[in-house]
Structures are given as C-alpha cells and as structure tokens.
Amino acid sequence: MFLSGCTAEEEQLIDEGGIEVPLATAFPNWSSTSHDSSEMNNSMFENESYVAYFSAPWCGHCESSLDAYDQVLPEGKMMIFSYDADEDYSDMNAWHNKTETNLNRTIDRPFMLNPPLAQAVGMNSLPFVLFVNPDGFVYHVQVGKFTDQDAITNLWQSTESAIVDEDGRWL
C-alpha cells in the first residue's frame, strides 16, 4: 500500500503566512424581458439576494440542475438566463413551456434571453450559476450539473448573510 502525502522524516518549516482573500466582484447591471413580457433589472433586487442561473434551451442535463434549484430557492429569488441568441433557441416562452412539460410541473421563474450578461459574468460552461448577496456581490459561482438540494440551501443561506468589508473583502 502506498499513501501519498508527507513522507520525509526530517522536520521542515512551513510558511504559514496569510492567504490572500479574493476581492468581491459586483454582479453587472442588467435588464431583460422575461418569457411573460415582464421587464426586469438588477435594481429590483436592491438589498436582496438572488441567483442568476445561466443555461440554454438545448442543454438537456441543465434541467435536472434547474429543477433542484427551483425546488429549494425562495420564490422570486432566481432568474433563468439563456446565453444562446440563435433564432432556434431565442423564444423564452417556448423554453419555459418545454421546461415545465419536461419537469411535469409549473416553474414560476422568469426565463430571459441575455447573451451580453452571460459574457459579462464570464460564463464558460452550462449551467453557470451565480449566488448574489444583498449588496450585489457575487458570493459563489457553481459550474456544471449540481443537484444537491441541501448544498444549494446552504449556499443560499450563506449568500444571504455574506458581508463585504470596506476594502471589498469577504468577512
């Protein structure tokens, strides 16, 4: 049996200096029209946490993740954005209806087309989910299929209480 790790017998001093904490990043300003023609923008969420869920109508594995987030996040706290402006996928009402049919239940979340916002947040995989704290800073980014509802709940609760100091560092 071979165990990886420290195998040297001689004692070594390890620098235990501080770890640089990344600066908080503000979620970009945005505005979109939802699948039901409602106008939405970031100012509607001033002093409130929310989740920005980026996906595409053709992403099959994204539906199970969307289902998990939808099951646990409070009403009105998740926006679903598509980055794909291709004519075949730009109908948000069709995407909303297809998702409801596939999940066999009502999804009471706004579905919005916003490729520039996807680019602004650096979306590089699907799904791409950002948890935004009440001050408008991105607290957590979750990339790829993620269906652990307990973990999503914990991330949401942490996001709601996440605080940024005056230097832009997470406390």
Please describe what each predicted stretch is.
Residues 96-135:
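Short, internal strand/loop/helix patches
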